Amino acid sequence: MSLYRTLIRPILFSLPSETAHEMGLKVLKTGLASGFLRGKTSFTEFGKIERFGLEFDNPLGLAAGFDKNAIAVDQLAALGFGFVEVGTVTYHPQPGNPKPRLFRLPQDEALINRAGFNNDGAAAVAERLKKKPPGCVLGVNIGKSKLVPNEQAVEDYLRSFELVHPVADYIAVNVSSPNTPNLRELQKADALEELLAALQKRNRELSERSAGVSPAVAGASRTRPVYEKPLLVKIAPDLTESEIEAIVDISLRQNLAGIIATNTTTVRDGLKTPAREVENMGQGGLSGKPLSQRSTDVISTIYRHSKGKLPVIGVGGIFTAEDAFEKICAGACLLQAYTGFIYQGFSFARDINRGLALLLKQKGFNSLNDAVGTSSPR
């Protein structure tokens, strides 16, 4: 049993969830936790993992939502995460929904949150990220400002995109949080295609400008150049199979780098936590172990429908190396975690990666890539 689980977690879990989260970020920012683990997070068993033009030290990233405002990126990377995704950030700074808005369900090893994209705004976060450490693959997750109606969503996303483009290694488009009114409407085919087409057009323009290449010289028929920022879309776990397949088709048409599967769920079936207690928590997205199978099923659908052509970052209910391995076999080539990190502590990334490397060897795989999609025949 780790020091975190026996000593630190009971203290943090005795506090209101968001207070504990803020305290944890402050501890991380001091470097104490990462200093303890530094030098103990070598993952040479994997070799480098190359996806959408980026090189990852290991497959496990930290999902958006933990470090919304990019205040502890280097310290989080030092804990052994192969990449860190900050945000969700919006063009307009916003306080999010009223507190309390983050709740623990220890019996289910889950969280319910209705944060509502509380963040300092894309401009402030982009300025902070200019100082990001070299070597840490950094994703920035962008969402729609609450005050902006869906009819003006494209321009709102474009403004955030332009601000974070110079500082992000990849950009994730969040259209799936259940905590911003009507946001999930943007997952519908016509709205999503319009949004992603506009972002990719701006992506090409910004990349060509930064590379000193004029659009006329670059040409319009070329596939994504290496200097374009990889663009991914983060989707909900509560979609039907046909809706997922439609998003896959759009993603392929718009030459997206991949899909992040999945965000939190609004479904609360089968929880161990008493129903009255859950009801009293109010609305919000559920994450953690209850989401695991649902997100794995979405990963499998994406992999099968795209015939393995569309990279998937699998997220939802990863607590153990076995959970991670299951998502790899379903079709994920990279992984993210959030709730598992909250429950397992500072050694979480190290433990998952070591366990995953061991599992791959035991199952006879020579590399992680060899295992991708093996349980989801195309």
PLM regions and their residue ranges:
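Active-site glycine- and acidic-residue-rich loops that bind
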Residues: S145-L158, R184-E185, A191, L232-R253
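Catalytic cores of alpha/beta
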Residues: N69-A78, L239-S251, G308, I318-L335
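C-terminal helical cap(s) of enzyme catalytic domains, especially alpha/beta-barrels
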Residues: Q94-E109, G270-G284, I342-F365
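Intrinsic, low-complexity polybasic segments
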Residues: E205, R209-V213, G219-S221, P225
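An N-cap/entry alpha-helix motif that binds or orients negatively charged groups
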Residues: L3-I49, N113-N118, A122-A123
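Glycine/Thr-rich beta-alpha phosphate-binding loop at enzyme active sites
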Residues: L25, K29-T30, F36-F43, P178-A191, ...
